[in-house]
Amino acid sequence: MINSAQYEFSCGVELESVDIQLDIERAYDLEYQFIMTSISHPRFNRDFTKASIGNSFSNKVAFTRSDTLLQSNYWRSSIVGKTSTNGIDLDSIDPTIRSNSVKTLKQEISWAAHLSLPSILLPTPSFNSTNYAQVVNQSLQSLSYMKVWIRIPLVSPKSQLLNKFDYYQDHNTSGGSGNNLVDNDNPWEWWNNFRLLCNQHPNLSAVLEMTSDLPSKEQLQQWLGEPVKCVIIPTSVFLTNKAGFPTLSKAHQQFLLQLFNYNIQFVVSGASMDTLKDYKTYLKFLHTNQNPLTQEEYFEMPYLDFLQAPLQPLMDNLESQTYEVFEKDPIKYKQYQNAVRLALLDLDKKDSKDDPIIIMVVGAGRGPLVNSSIQASIEANKFVKVFAVEKNPNAIVTLRNRIIMEGWEEIVTVIDSDMRDWNTEYRADIMVSELLGSFGDNELSPECLDGAQRYLKKDTGISIPTWYTSYIAPISSSKLFNEVTAYGDLKHSETPYVVKPHNFHQLAESKPLFTFSHPNRDEIIDNSRYESLEFELTIPSTTCHGFIGYFDCCLYKDVHISINPSNFSTGMFSWFPIYFPLKQPVYFSNGNLNNNNNNNIKAKCAFWRNVSKSKVWYEWCLLSPTITPIQNVGGRSYYIGL
């Protein structure tokens, strides 16, 4: 049985530590992995209102403990530092308070870096924390090891108070600048403003603080596209069961179960040492009792959020290990076998050993579709002759050996040729291919099949697949955006990537984009395409980092293979989605729109599929709520060679 969790459970405890050595030992005894505690000593006080806060920054009085209290490996692995919160205000209108706050934060960040702490937790920003962000951004430039965490509540204190007294609805409908009020009171907006001012630095992450009230489901899902590294769970959020032990509401449990699928640490806050173990035991129980990983999820784990360049099937030959991965798919070839069987049964032809049904497998690879076709003929009780057309000379070697091993010599003929160049007098009753990419047509299935369809019987020939459609949707994913940005050049920001997205939030349901049908009987075949699509977002505000692409393919009649979420072929893992990045993230907000019918965000994009004599490429852009430059103009950064 496959383990039930993708990631190990890591849980710490937040406390104000006077004796840090003793508290670490206690935490370990209670099976916590680390403690989260203030960098400055809890007995050290500063007066931020004084023009000079004297000994606070002098060498006469130490503001914290000595680094020699613990060995360096404990500082590096067992402690997350917290900066001061009492009295600190880096955006105060009082210049004295502001200046002293800046000095304090810089001093504590410097000390945390000196200790080699893995992470440092900073206080919650407000909607306008410009100076606070500037100080943090400066520090981020010099931190090579330590990560900076920003504490963000799921629901703002103001909203929690209003919910408690049941005034929230009146508060939102009492007139005035309602949209601005919602934005200013939305913790995601605080986080978004802060990280944008810090240029989305990859070492800056959010720490979510659970609240008794939870925001809407859409707003919770929004955090799945953000760089959340830790979740703090105050004991006040827990309920007590009949046995007197802590438990969480169903809504909190459901959100936690989602978070367990990410590499996130957890922290219990507000408990006394006497009750700490009960909270850890409960959270560990939830983590352990997840559903086991499916074979598909287990296979996908190493590829989560890992960017891969799409294949160039006509320019490059696939390697043996690539074929091997594709051939392990438990769903794809069963569906092909079903499609071929139905097609064989539908053919109005009397077959015999001397006059068999002709099946051409174009792009045969190492033979999985050949096998599916033969198995389908056995099920349909039909005599067939199979031509296996393949351009890769290395795959040809495997294919010829397989024919001998399987005893297919009387059934299968291997054609060592590009399907577009092969000449034969035979005409196929059925043409079978698996030339699809993550976006359907992005591995040149239309161009390949258009070149090969001259071998298909004109009036009665059947193509498998019959048609396929690409789908697209806007997404938010700081992770994917930062992965692309790390390359630091134009080429990578205009390249689509095959990826199994994990740390992302799809902002709307995907919509169909380009469709191709086979055989294509148009007198003049044109595989270039242009479409613009509009999406309606129900979330009040978000950041768009690009688009995620899928495909749905009809092999024959009602037999489909699909990676589109709405009709995904469960268990199939031959294809991951495709990610089209935007060069810069784009902020969406319903507060910026004047919709008459509702306040939902309307986002519109445009996509082009361009074709020349030597290459095929995509171009894309955003059209609303703001216009972005068209990317990959003329295929300057990425194309698929013909």
UniProtKB/Swiss-Prot annotation:
Region annotated Dimerization sits at 477-493
* Residue span of region Beta barrel: 465-642
- List each copy of the SAM-dependent MTase PRMT-type domain by range: 307-620
InterPro entries with a match to the protein in the record = Arg_MeTrfase, Arg_MeTrfase_PRMT5, PRMT5, PRMT5_C, PRMT5_TIM, SAM-dependent_MTases_sf
Q: Where's the active site on this chain?
A: E434 (proton donor/acceptor), E443 (proton donor/acceptor)
GO CC entries: cytosol; nucleus
Cross-referenced PROSITE patterns, in alphabetical order? SAM_MT_PRMT
* EC numbers, comma separated: 2.1.1.320
Provide the reaction this enzyme catalyses.
Answer: L-arginyl-[protein] + 2 S-adenosyl-L-methionine = N(omega),N(omega)'-dimethyl-L-arginyl-[protein] + 2 S-adenosyl-L-homocysteine + 2 H(+)
- One GO term of the biological process aspect: methylation
| GO function terms (MF aspect) | histone arginine N-methyltransferase activity; protein-arginine N-methyltransferase activity; protein-arginine omega-N symmetric methyltransferase activity
Does this UniProt record's set of keywords contain Methyltransferase?
Answer: yes
Keyword line? Chromatin regulator, Methyltransferase, S-adenosyl-L-methionine, Transcription, Transcription regulation, Transferase
Chain residues that bind S-adenosyl-L-methionine: Y323, K332, Y333, E390, D418, M419
Chain segments carrying region TIM barrel: 1-286
Where is the site Critical for specifying symmetric addition of methyl groups? F326
Q: Where does a protein bind?
A: F326, E434, E443
Outline what the protein does: Methylates arginine residues in proteins such as small nuclear ribonucleoproteins or histone H2A/H4.
Question: What protein family is recorded?
Answer: Belongs to the class I-like SAM-binding methyltransferase superfamily. Protein arginine N-methyltransferase family.
Annotated protein name in UniProt: Protein arginine N-methyltransferase 5
Organism annotation = Dictyostelium discoideum (Social amoeba)
